[in-house]
Amino acid sequence: MAAAAAMTAAGCGGAGAARSLSRFRGCLAGALLGDCVGAVYEARDTVDLTSVLRQVQDLEPDPGSPGSARTEALCYTDDTAMARALVQSLLAKEAFDEVDMAHRFAQEYKKDPDRGYGAGVITVFRKHLSPRCRDVFEPARAQFNGKGSYGNGGAMRVAGISLAYSSVQDVQKFARLSAQLTHASSLGYNGAILQALAVHLALQGESSSEHFLEQLLGHMEELESDAQSVLDARELGMEERPYSSRLKKIGELLEQDSVTREEVVSELGNGIAAFESVPTAIYCFLRCMEPDPEIPSTFNSLQRTLVYSISLGGDTDTIATMAGAIAGAYYGMEQVPESWQQSCEGYEETDVLAQSLHRVFQKSL
């Protein structure tokens, strides 16, 4: 597959100008779809592509019928619950406010705890709910004997930061801070920054996958050169700049004519660690810009991205929600099938949040 696959305006399916309303709506809709459909397969080591295709095709109503074929909505997980809480905080404060965001995360968990939250983050939220909590970043710093978490929880929810802030500097700053509320390891918050940057670039409409990767690599090589990032990677016995090395691997995989799912998982991962899932989501987006002989040609690029990302197995809901956010930001709402969207729990509120973000944060641009 050519590394410089075309990413032209025509390929965006009418998404419009950079940071258009269609892109905002597509971003959050794509993220919701990835979470809801991906949750069906979460934690399976292997996922049969035929099963995923059957699952999404069952969302389609009979020809001429509106809406979804499902009688019960596909439920979202903690991925969407936290992504929505993040957006709601940004809208309420019209800026990043760490105290408000931490409070909303914790209250969302308290209100609806059965969404699949991990044990570690539950401990953080319980501390946030305590009246004795004076520093909202301290509970995350105390995790894992003071080393902090390097899971993908900061990355899975971060898309709203990319929608709210238009400069690379702000995207990096607030992606880091929003992630550090629960993930204090640089291997965790750097993953959130990478995901936020990928959504940011997708919102602009880039010219090629090669350029897309080059920009991400430039940012991550700089970010991962700081002393804390080097130390955290070394303590885990990893290579220096683990995200940068995986971005380079993505470029190599895209150059190959044929890559099996097993190879992708072996090289990039499909786990709950941020470095085993964020690069994978980016690869899914870039790979699926071109047709896949195993996926029906009637599927558009966003649909292809979602199906392919879920077929990799592992942490399917989170990898698919991240890939869906990137693809939705790039291709826009025009590539979100109505029947798929309406199959998801909370799809109407998600769309309202996207429109509100665009109205509030685009007014000064």
Curated annotation (Swiss-Prot):
Activity modulation notes: The protein undergoes a dramatic conformational switch from closed to open states upon substrate-binding, which enables specific substrate recognition for the 1''-O-linkage. The glutamate flap (Glu-42) blocks substrate entrance to Mg(2+) in the unliganded closed state. In presence of substrate, Glu-42 is ejected from the active site: this closed-to-open transition significantly widens the substrate-binding channel and precisely positions the scissile 1''-O-linkage for cleavage while securing tightly 2'- and 3'-hydroxyls of ADP-ribose.
UniProt protein name: ADP-ribosylhydrolase ARH3
Highest taxon above the source species: Eukaryota
Oligomeric and partner information: Monomer.
Similarity remark: Belongs to the ADP-ribosylglycohydrolase family.
Site (Glutamate flap): 42
Reaction equations catalysed: [(1''->2')-ADP-alpha-D-ribose](n) + H2O = [(1''->2')-ADP-alpha-D-ribose](n-1) + ADP-D-ribose; 1''-O-acetyl-ADP-alpha-D-ribose + H2O = ADP-D-ribose + acetate + H(+); O-(ADP-D-ribosyl)-L-seryl-[protein] + H2O = ADP-D-ribose + L-seryl-[protein]; alpha-NAD(+) + H2O = ADP-D-ribose + nicotinamide + H(+)
Record: residues binding Mg(2+) 2: 42, 315, 317-318
Annotated EC: 3.5.1.-, 3.2.1.143, 3.2.2.-
Entry binding sites for substrate: 78, 147-153, 183, 236, 272
Annotated function: ADP-ribosylhydrolase that preferentially hydrolyzes the scissile alpha-O-linkage attached to the anomeric C1'' position of ADP-ribose and acts on different substrates, such as proteins ADP-ribosylated on serine and threonine, free poly(ADP-ribose) and O-acetyl-ADP-D-ribose. Specifically acts as a serine mono-ADP-ribosylhydrolase by mediating the removal of mono-ADP-ribose attached to serine residues on proteins, thereby playing a key role in DNA damage response. Serine ADP-ribosylation of proteins constitutes the primary form of ADP-ribosylation of proteins in response to DNA damage.
Record GO cellular component, one term: mitochondrial matrix
Compartments (UniProt record): Nucleus; Cytoplasm; Chromosome; Mitochondrion matrix
GO MF annotation list: ADP-ribosylserine hydrolase activity; hydrolase activity, hydrolyzing O-glycosyl compounds; magnesium ion binding; O-acetyl-ADP-ribose deacetylase activity; poly(ADP-ribose) glycohydrolase activity
Any one Gene Ontology BP term: peptidyl-serine ADP-deribosylation
Gene3D superfamilies: ADP-ribosylation/Crystallin J1
EC main group: hydrolase
Source lineage: Eukaryota, Metazoa, Chordata, Craniata, Vertebrata
Gene that produces this protein: ADPRS
Cofactor: Mg(2+)
Any one Pfam family match given in the protein's UniProt record, by short name: ADP_ribosyl_GH
Keyword annotations: Chromosome, Cytoplasm, DNA damage, DNA repair, Hydrolase, Magnesium, Metal-binding, Mitochondrion, Nucleus
Cofactor binding comment, as recorded: Binds 2 magnesium ions per subunit.
Binding site for Mg(2+) 1: 77-79, 317
